[in-house]
Every structure is written in C-alpha cells, then in structure tokens.
C-alpha cells in the first residue's frame, strides 16, 4: 500500500508502546522518495528534497532538545538497506541531529564546551552511549541481523508480509502484477512470515531503546 515504509514503523511502535514507557511522536510520512521506481503521476509518490528534510528535522530536534528530551530515537525503513552508508532521507535526519546537537551545546554551554574539564570523560561516555551526540539516534527499522534472516524488498514478499501482519486491510493481492519485477515475490507473502518479521523488529527496537 501507499505509505508502507511509514506504516511498518508505526505499526511496530504501536505494539511496542504497549510494553514500554515511550513518548511516540506523530509519524512523518514524507521523505526523499525519488522517482526511481515509477513516475508520480497516477501512482502516488511524493518526493521531498533531502535539503528541505534536513532543515525541517533540525528545527524539530532543536525544539525537542529545548523541551528537555535527551533520549530521542527515530526509525526509518525507506531505502534502509544502505543505512550504514546512508541514503538521502536517513542522511538528512542524521545530519539534522548532529547540527541541532552542536547548536544546542554551543548555545547552552558556550565556546570551548568540549575542552572544558567537565568533558574529561567524553570518550568513555561516547563508548557507552551517554555523550551528548547520543541524545538523538537514528535506526533502520531492520538492522543487519534482521536483513540476514528476513527478506528485504520493495513491495515483495517481505514488505507485503509485514502489511499482512500489521495492517491486513491495506493489502490487495488482486492488484498484484507480474510486470513489476521487484514485486514478483509478493505472491509468496503471508501473515505468518510477517509476524516473524515484526517480532524480529520488536526485539531490535527493545535493544536500541534499552
């Protein structure tokens, strides 16, 4: 379905929220989708340039830091098979997080904040994930461990199975076509496989959220 990349994140967080004490912000549906798969006309893709995303995300992160949040996490599924190297959407949010954190530290602690004796434990804090640059962390919905065990695709078996498990009413297999090579494996999708994927994702989320 349209919006699958966001629905997958939203659906998994909805389940996780029932067992963890979380503040879940409204989902953000727009990203640097590109039109690499198909033209947008009569299809539905909306592309937002990564520079615009970065500016928006930076303002949002800056506001959350001022409110007092120090344990912020965002999850991205779109094009996240390249999350380590980065793709336009996740790079925009990662860069925004760094810029917002730097600006906040400079505003609240002043010049020389990193060289201050109070930061003498910076490298130890960084190793354990408690330094200021760990206040905002980005994650792929599926980490490398999941990618090794669950099919990652575009509207294929893996993604269709996730939707069958999380939002079954959004799946219309009668509209499946063999014309799209990337969606050919969707005929093998099942809610059972999707539930396996969801459980792996939830385990991943529990690990990174602590």
Which stretches of residues belong to each language-model region?
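Extended, histidine- and acidic-residue-enriched regions that form the cofactor-binding/catalytic faces
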Residues: 1-210
């Amino acid at each position: 379905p349209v919006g699958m990349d966001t629905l997958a994140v939203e659906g998994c967080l909805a389940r996780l929220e029932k067992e963890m004490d979380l503040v879940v912000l409204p989902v953000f549906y727009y990203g640097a989708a590109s039109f690499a798969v198909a033209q947008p006309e009569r299809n539905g893709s909306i592309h937002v340039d990564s520079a615009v995303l970065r500016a928006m995300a930076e303002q949002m992160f800056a506001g959350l830091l001022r409110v007092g949040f120090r344990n912020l996490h965002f999850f991205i599924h779109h094009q996240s098979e390249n999350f380590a190297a980065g793709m336009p959407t996740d790079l925009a949010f990662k860069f925004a997080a760094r810029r917002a954190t730097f600006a906040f530290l400079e505003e609240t602690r002043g010049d020389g904040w990193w060289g201050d004796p109070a930061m003498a434990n910076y490298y130890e804090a960084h190793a354990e994930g408690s330094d200021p640059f760990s206040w905002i962390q980005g994650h792929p919905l599926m980490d490398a461990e999941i990618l090794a065990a669950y099919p990652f695709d575009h509207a294929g078996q893996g993604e269709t199975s996730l939707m069958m498990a999380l939002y079954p009413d959004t799946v219309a297999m009668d509209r499946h076509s063999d014309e799209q090579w990337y969606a050919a494996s969707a005929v093998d999708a099942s809610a059972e496989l999707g539930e396996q994927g969801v459980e792996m994702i939830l385990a991943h989320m529990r690990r990174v959220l602590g």
